Amino acid sequence: MASVTITSVHEPANPLAVAHTGEREVEGDQLIKTDTNNDNDIINTLLNNFLYPQELKHNVFVPRFQQRITIVKAWDILSLSTSPPNGTNGANGTNSAPHRPKDLHILDIGCGQGESAATMAALLQPHMHGARLHITGIDTARPDYGTPYTVAETHAHLTASALGRHISFRREDAAAFFSPSRLSSPSPPGSWPSAANVDAVTLCHSLWYFPTPQSVADLFTTLAGARVPRVYLAEYSFRGSLPGGQQDAHILAARAQALLHASVLEKLSADSSQQNHQGREPGPRAPNVRAALDVGSIVEAAAAAGWAVRRQGTFVPAADMIEGHLEARLVVKDAFAEAVRAEGLSPEREHEVLGLVPGVKEAFARLAEAGVAKGRAMDVWWAELER
């Protein structure tokens, strides 16, 4: 069971929200734990509706879905339906009880193959009590991206599943989704869901894929202009709270990949080729970790567009979440060093990037000395933003 620290100015008010335990204080935050009584049922629902390689079921997809369940519960999105916030985009401006649940349209930005959209559909729909739920997932990835199943294949499978009536996908970015023409056009009857009635935006482990810090800042500006009431974030934090440096390999490897990406952008910018690089899909020469802003930089970018943190917290991923370990293993392989050298960076930049690799190897060596087979994923930070 994942432990979650939370800082909140508003108490969660729905059956999916994480429950307070009051067992101890951590740096002024209250330690809470997620209620996992129904998590296995939710995970089974997701596994029955999602397209994935069976051989990766237990090692990859069960922990991946469990992590997203922890995130969605911490976000407490359901409160937008049961107790609408004051503001725009369909909220009635009151919190009087009793309140009939309102329809909920969530925009999942950087949805990838749809894990987070599926998790929200499976977790939230049973509690809508007759109100409508729809998750629109958007991503700029090519339809043929992904292996062994492509983005197009996983999207088609999911939308044809039992969860599919609550999910749709578009290949576009937030600026296109919230284009002025869509926002300014009158909404005819039956137009729900649309760009004009988004109740919340989610970014679940997707901000690290953004190409530049400026692209993250532009996103928050776009969301502010669209008058979205709430934004929910979840991203790795570049911090580890476990003892013995168990998360160091993941942290250092992510820094190496982010520095490589920034260095390549810097070089291509000088060559007037940055736009081509930004459209390049992840691969041996474009790691999954791109701009990879830390928590402070994300909050700063959001604040510049008028967003404030309403609630936030952190949690340590479960021990069986191996994605951090796999990212770190990629960095210590010879292929990573070869990819760095193939980019044609300046000697100084190449030395700086490759100079982080020994630290990752040393982190693995310390774990081996302690009898630990795998490194742990770094802490996850989540937040709810409002304007």
Curated annotation (Swiss-Prot):
Keywords: Methyltransferase, S-adenosyl-L-methionine, Transferase
Pathway membership: Mycotoxin biosynthesis
Protein name as annotated: Methyltransferase phomM'
Family recorded in the similarity comment: Belongs to the class I-like SAM-binding methyltransferase superfamily. Erg6/SMT family.
Function text: Methyltransferase; part of the gene cluster that mediates the biosynthesis of the phomopsins, a group of hexapeptide mycotoxins which infects lupins and causes lupinosis disease in livestock. Within the pathway, phomM' acts as an S-adenosylmethionine-dependent alpha-N-methyltransferase that catalyzes two successive N-methylation reactions, converting N-desmethyl-phomopsin A to phomopsin A and phomopsin A further to an N,N-dimethylated congener called phomopsin E.
GO molecular function: methyltransferase activity
GO biological process, one term: methylation
Organism expressing this protein natively: Diaporthe leptostromiformis
InterPro entries in alphabetical order: SAM-dependent_MTases_sf (IPR029063)
Class of the enzyme per the UniProt entry, highest EC level: transferase
Name of the coding gene: phomM'
Residue segments, region Methyltransferase domain: 98-223
EC number: 2.1.1.-
